[in-house]
Amino acid sequence: MASSFSAESAERIIVALDGMAPDQALAFSAQVQGLRWVKVGLELFVQAGPEVVIQLRNQGLRVFLDLKFHDIPTTMAGACLRAAALGAELITVHACAGSEALQAAQAAVVEGAQSTGQPVPTLLAVTVLTSWEEHRLQRELAVEQGIAERVSQLALLAAKAGVGGCVCSPLEVASLRAQHREPFALVTPGIRPQGTSVGDQVRVMTPPAAIEAGASQLVIGRPITQSENPSGAFAQCCTALST
């Protein structure tokens, strides 16, 4: 049956394979009609290892490897080089690792991809996790800035380091897009279709609103993966972006 949504809409949605065993993740990704992108996070990667990235790519999928590297520059660069060599097309690092580490990571993803004939991935700098609330950020980490100001500072740091984009909550997308035009990518989790539970995310938005605000791609997990009809839930999200 022909899809009711455009390929462009499908490219904008990354389905997070969180909470799945390796076999479940592979079976799930194979069954969702029209799926283009999947996210492999820490839990799945630790269970399955690098092979899961290769297996998902063999299904014709594009992989967002969301391991959020945060270490000294040499270590971050080595990890990013190997992630790029696997064929992951989006890779995350923490912006607060600093400019030297970000520059080293960016150079490494280019080297890793080119040395193995893979597409050069987009390196994404994580700003402030969507589970953080402003009062906790100030109390627990002694960050005096508000979340919006902190996100803006970290995104600027990433852009100056030559990183290809950042990860932020949908609530910061509009202000960041005003500061950083395309092709600087803004990838946002914290996406919840109308009428679904927000779960452990506290800074959330619907898919159409996030795209309208300037997001490049959206990360959606449980509203699709825990649906009784994952293909239908994915199609509904895509259709919402097509209208």
Curated annotation (Swiss-Prot):
Annotated pathway: Pyrimidine metabolism; UMP biosynthesis via de novo pathway; UMP from orotate: step 2/2
PANTHER family documented for this protein: OROTIDINE 5'-PHOSPHATE DECARBOXYLASE (PTHR32119:SF2)
Gene field: pyrF
Keywords: Decarboxylase, Lyase, Pyrimidine biosynthesis
Family of the protein in this entry: Belongs to the OMP decarboxylase family. Type 1 subfamily.
Subunit structure: Homodimer.
InterPro entries the record matches: Aldolase_TIM (IPR013785), OMPdecase (IPR014732), OMPdecase_AS (IPR018089), OMPdecase_bac (IPR047596), OMPdeCOase_dom (IPR001754), RibuloseP-bd_barrel (IPR011060)
Catalytic activity reported: orotidine 5'-phosphate + H(+) = UMP + CO2
Record bears the keyword Cell inner membrane: no
CDD domains xrefs: OMP_decarboxylase_like
Function per UniProt: Catalyzes the decarboxylation of orotidine 5'-monophosphate (OMP) to uridine 5'-monophosphate (UMP).
The protein's name in its UniProt record: Orotidine 5'-phosphate decarboxylase
Residues at the active site: K68
GO annotation, biological process: 'de novo' pyrimidine nucleobase biosynthetic process; 'de novo' UMP biosynthetic process
GO CC, one annotated term: cytosol
Gene3D superfamilies for this protein: Aldolase class I (3.20.20.70)
GO terms assigned for molecular function: orotidine-5'-phosphate decarboxylase activity
Record field: transmembrane: none
Statement: the UniProt record of this protein carries the keyword Lyase: yes
One Pfam family in the UniProt entry: OMPdecase
Binding locations of substrate: 18, 39, 66-75, 130, 192, 201, 221-222
Listed EC numbers: 4.1.1.23
